[in-house]
Regions:
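Conserved glycine-rich cofactor-binding loop
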Residues: 12-13
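The beta1-alpha1 cofactor-binding region of Rossmann-like NAD(H)/NADP(H)-dependent oxidoreductases
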Residues: 59-69
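Active-site helix of classical SDR
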Residues: 128, 162
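Residue(s) in the substrate-gating loop at a strand-loop-helix junction
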Residues: 146
Length: 267
């Protein structure tokens, strides 16, 4: 008999952890929640807080060999993925180029700009591709994008580009999977109060204005779960970010970029 599971990447902290916490009290038809991230001890802490039976998969999802292990485990457990939630990712702020830290080569800084592309784009695509055969009618995919996907972001260039990829890929995938009744929701929050900024601001600072729109991970996840339930293709939390989304559709991007650059220079 197949086991119904929820699979969450980036589950050790932040939004991924919050998804595990909020989904745990529901879904009596779910047999296990699978938690995926690199830090085993952090995953164990999350698992200990859940009532559902859990499976900890401590792995680096940018490594193909480790994704093979995930596929093998899905086969061994005869898993049916009812929800795939891709939250693994990170961002780095600051001017692009060899300034601080020194991105002289991929080898010098494996967790730098190229690392964002590998994790935010390649790994998300790869894990989605591998998980699709284990999904069934009514399954859900939730992909963590960002409001940064709506517009190019100076001094956040690579991160914004990776999230634009996630949004575009996920919307297209959702159209492909409609006939199978598998539904994809892209979550596009603005700044969220998580450890994300501890990493992001090691190389630069965000606009002070953005921090005034910061919301809790609880609020973002609650909205995302609701939007996924109603089969919505996008989940945009908070009125300021919803207004920003409309703005990026109505106003030429260059005009908005000029304002962003002006505000950055005045800080």
């Amino acid at each position: 008999m197949r086991k119904n599971i929820i699979l969450i990447t980036g589950a050790s902290s932040g939004i991924g952890r919050e998804f595990a916490m909020q989904l745990d009290p529901y879904f009596s038809n779910i047999d296990e929640i699978w938690l995926v991230a690199r830090r085993k001890e952090k995953l164990a802490e999350v698992a200990s807080s859940l009532q559902h039976k859990t499976r900890i998969l401590a792995m680096d999802i940018t490594k193909e060999a480790q994704l093979e292990r995930l596929t093998d485990t899905l086969d061994d457990r005869k898993a049916c993925i009812r929800m795939l939630i891709n939250c693994a990712g990170y961002g780095l702020m600051g001017a692009f180029g060899p300034s601080k830290p020194d991105f002289r080569s991929e080898e010098d800084c494996p967790d730098g700009q190229l690392g964002m592309i590998r994790l935010n784009c390649e790994a998300l695509t790869h894990i989605t591709y591998r998980c699709l055969p284990y999904m069934a009618k009514g399954s859900r995919i939730i992909q963590l994008a960002s409001s940064a996907a709506f517009l190019p972001q100076p001094y956040f260039a690579v991160y914004a580009a990776t999230k634009a990829y996630v949004l575009s890929f996920s919307r297209a995938l959702g159209e492909e999977l409609k006939k199978k009744e598998i539904y994809v929701t892209s979550v596009c929050p603005g700044p969220v109060d998580t450890p994300f900024f501890e990493t992001a601001e090691k190389t630069g600072t965000t606009l002070a204005l953005k921090k005034y729109t910061m919301v809790s991970s609880e609020r973002v996840v609650e909205q995302a779960i609701r939007d996924s339930y109603y089969k919505r293709t996008m989940s945009v939390c908070s009125m300021p970010i919803q207004a920003f989304q409309v703005l990026t559709k109505c106003v030429p991007h260059q005009m908005i970029l000029n304002v962003m650059n002006y505000l950055k220079e005045r800080e």
